[in-house]
From Swiss-Prot:
It comes from Saimiri boliviensis boliviensis. It is found in: Secreted. The lineage of its organism: Eukaryota, Metazoa, Chordata, Craniata, Vertebrata. Pfam families: Hormone_1. GO terms for biological process: animal organ development; growth hormone receptor signaling pathway; positive regulation of growth; positive regulation of receptor signaling pathway via JAK-STAT; response to nutrient levels. Belongs to the somatotropin/prolactin family. Its main location: secreted. The modification Phosphoserine is found at residue 132. GO terms for molecular function: growth factor activity; growth hormone receptor binding; hormone activity; metal ion binding. Residues 1-26 form the signal peptide. PANTHER family: SOMATOTROPIN, SOMATOTROPIN,PROLACTIN. This is Somatotropin. Disulfide bonds join 79-191, 208-215. Keywords: Disulfide bond, Hormone, Metal-binding, Phosphoprotein, Secreted, Signal, Zinc. Gene3D superfamilies: 1.20.1250.10.
Length: 217
């Protein structure tokens, strides 16, 4: 038999048998520990970027007196995520199941898809990272995918299609260059840092519960 014919037959056999091979488990499933490691790396990258950018912006543009007045004013320091039901204490967090913590994390991530675009100039001018809003958006999308995969593993394996939050943060004027705009950008960075901290914390708890020897890392 000619080489080309043998190759064609082998390809046809492989395509015919592919569904059976999948059902029989011939393709190894990615370990849960690896999925959690990947999600944690992505969450930590976002949290670190949010924290460092917030701190850099604060040191460069926000006088101490403005910082304190901002943080003490509930109207300026209120984040959109406050409307998302999240655990308010360590005890409440521990009472949530792994799946609940993943769902909350997913909602927090999705709530930043549009708002992060309002910080394009801040990210572009950062001396620490020099990333664009599209880069941060891709980081968020990567983590969203990782969390969704974890949720599928913890459920019945069927994909979830939840509603994506499209908060616009309309109170932030990206075209303004005055001091008020600086405070608004500062507020947005404050909320981004706060929410990414929550996501990393929730994922760390899920990892600690699920993977032996992973607590404290």
């Amino acid at each position: 038999m000619a080489t080309g014919s043998r190759t064609s037959l082998l390809l046809a056999f492989t395509l015919l048998c592919l569904p059976q091979l999948k059902e029989a488990g011939a393709f190894p499933t990615i370990p849960l520990s690896r999925l959690l490691d990947n999600a944690m790396l992505r969450a930590h990258r976002l949290h670190q970027l949010a924290f460092d950018t917030y701190q850099e912006f604060e040191e460069a543009y926000i006088p101490k007196e403005q910082k304190y007045s901002f943080l003490q004013n509930p109207q300026t320091s209120l984040c959109f995520s406050e409307s998302i039901p999240t655990p308010a204490s360590k005890k409440e967090t521990q009472q949530k199941s792994n799946l609940e913590l993943l769902r909350i994390s997913l909602i927090l991530i999705q709530s930043w898809f549009e708002p992060v675009q309002l910080l394009r100039s801040v990210f572009a001018n950062s001396l620490l990272y020099g990333v664009s809003d599209s880069d941060v958006y891709e980081y968020l999308k990567d983590l969203e995918e990782g969390i969704q995969t974890l949720m599928e593993r913890l459920e019945d394996g069927s994909p979830r299609t939840g509603a994506i939050f499209r908060q616009t943060y309309s109170k932030f004027d990206i075209n303004s260059q005055n001091d008020d705009a600086l405070l608004k950008n500062y507020g947005l960075l404050y909320c981004f840092r706060k929410d990414m901290d929550k996501v990393e914390t929730f994922l760390r708890i899920v990892q600690c519960r699920s993977v032996e020897g992973s607590c404290g890392f």
